[in-house]
Design a protein with these regions (language model features):
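Short glycine/acidic-enriched loop and turn motifs that connect beta-strands
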Residues: 46-50, 100-102, 139-143, 187-189, ...
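Blade-level signature of beta-propeller repeat domains, shared across WD40, Kelch, NHL, RCC1
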Residues: 326-328, 332-352
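Repeated scaffold domains used in trafficking and secretory/extracellular systems
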Residues: 30, 80-85, 120-128, 168-177, ...
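An edge-strand/N-cap motif at the start of beta-rich repeat modules
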Residues: 29-63
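Residue position within the beta-strands of beta-propeller blades
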Residues: 42, 95, 135-136, 182, ...
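Short coil/turn segments that connect the beta-strands within blades of beta-propeller domains
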Residues: 37-38, 90-92, 130-131, 177-179, ...
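Bacterial Sec-dependent N-terminal signal peptides
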Residues: 1-5, 11-40
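A short beta-strand motif characteristic of beta-propeller blades
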Residues: 64-78, 110-116, 158-164, 197-204, ...
Length: 352
């Protein structure tokens, strides 16, 4: 996931020269583009502080995108300020709106069903049972000693049922063997929650960490951040979730860049990650690839998603962080397919 601190500073700079914020009129939604069938749901973060977060939808069937799908389904209402991520469960979408401190629940046609408030600065949501989900929260490194929590969400009543103290900037989560593994952007641990009783444990990984995915062997891959100041290279580590131990460490041979997005293909055998360029790595590899399969070039790569069915690669482009973004589509061998327009700052993507 893109390190939000970098984005905050970027917006602080950009904000001094912004004089207006364009508000597009939501289009009519073509039948088939957002109603049923396979589609890519794109979280358009919007400008920080501008309350213009939106949802774009790419439909592979007619090879087109619909911008402002949520607004069009909800009387032109905005989702709020900074749409961080989305999760699907039981034919509902859970949109995590970071700077608005809320989660919006909608049906598959993007019609709002509920708004859940009371979060600190929510990042990601992970559903662990039919009535329970965890929500991670952001605390900036400058406030590293501030108390932070993982919120427990009752998805039957759409309320926060409990808060679990977990200091630092909690980020992505994945479930394995009845446990939930939580990355942390300003702590050198991956935290482990018992999904049944919320008991807390941790695994020391040696550096701050951001992304996590589960492979075909039920092993967990975590992206550990680089630190030029401490001469620490970015790394991928593999965790055995039965023993909760690190069983492999792969250096990415750079102290200047960190992985911003980490994905895995549908059968869980190939990792894809974004570190300026797009990289591809087999889960059995002993070393990292030295070159990417898709070069960033003059673009501003920001989001990454892999179609679990056919391994189509989707890469989003934030362009200038102020105007509409772009979506690039590639075959699994990196052959270019097409370019599509999205809303402002397309980030997290979900193939549904």
């Amino acid at each position: 996931m893109i390190t939000r601190v970098k984005i905050y500073f970027l917006f602080a700079i950009i904000g001094t020269i912004m004089v207006s914020c364009r508000k597009d009129t939501p289009p009519s939604l073509p039948q088939g583009s957002v109603n049923g069938g396979k589609r890519l749901v794109i979280c358009d973060e919007g400008g920080f502080g501008y309350n213009n977060a939106a949802v774009s939808v790419y439909d592979p069937t007619n090879n087109s995108t619909v911008i402002n799908a949520y607004a069009a389904a909800n009387s032109n209402q905005s989702l709020g300020d900074v749409l961080q991520s989305v999760t699907e469960f039981n034919d509902k979408y859970y949109f995590v709106v970071n700077n608005s401190g809320k989660v919006i629940v909608s049906d598959k046609n993007f019609v709002r069903l509920a708004t859940i408030s009371g979060f600190i600065s929510p990042r990601y949501i992970l559903v662990v049972s039919n009535n329970k989900a965890y929500v991670s929260n952001l605390v900036l490194p400058t406030n590293a000693n501030q108390t932070n929590y993982i919120q427990v969400l009752d998805i039957a009543t759409n309320t926060i049922s409990k808060s679990i103290r977990l200091d630092g900037w909690t980020e992505q989560m994945v479930q394995s063997y009845g446990k939930v593994y939580v990355t942390n952007q300003n702590k050198k641990y991956v935290y482990v929650l018992d999904a049944l009783n919320d008991g807390l444990d941790s695994i020391y990984v040696g550096s701050t960490n951001a992304c996590i995915v589960k492979d075909a062997n039920e092993k967990l891959w975590v992206s550990c951040n680089a630190s030029a100041a401490n001469n620490v290279s970015a790394r991928l580590i593999r965790i055995n979730p039965i023993a909760d131990t690190i069983e492999a460490t792969i250096s990415l041979q750079t102290t200047q860049n960190s992985i911003s997005r980490l994905c895995i293909n549908g059968d869980g055998t190939t990792l894809y990650y974004l570190m300026n360029d797009v990289y591809k790595m087999d889960i059995n590899a002993a070393v990292c690839p030295t070159t990417g399969i898709i070069a960033q070039s003059t673009h501003t790569f920001y989001g990454l998603c892999i179609d679990p069915a056919d391994e189509t690669i989707y890469v989003s482009d934030a362009v200038d962080y102020n105007s509409n973004g772009k979506l690039y589509r590639y075959q699994s061998n990196a052959n270019y397919i097409g370019t599509y327009t999205t809303g402002i700052i397309p980030g997290f993507m979900l193939m549904d």
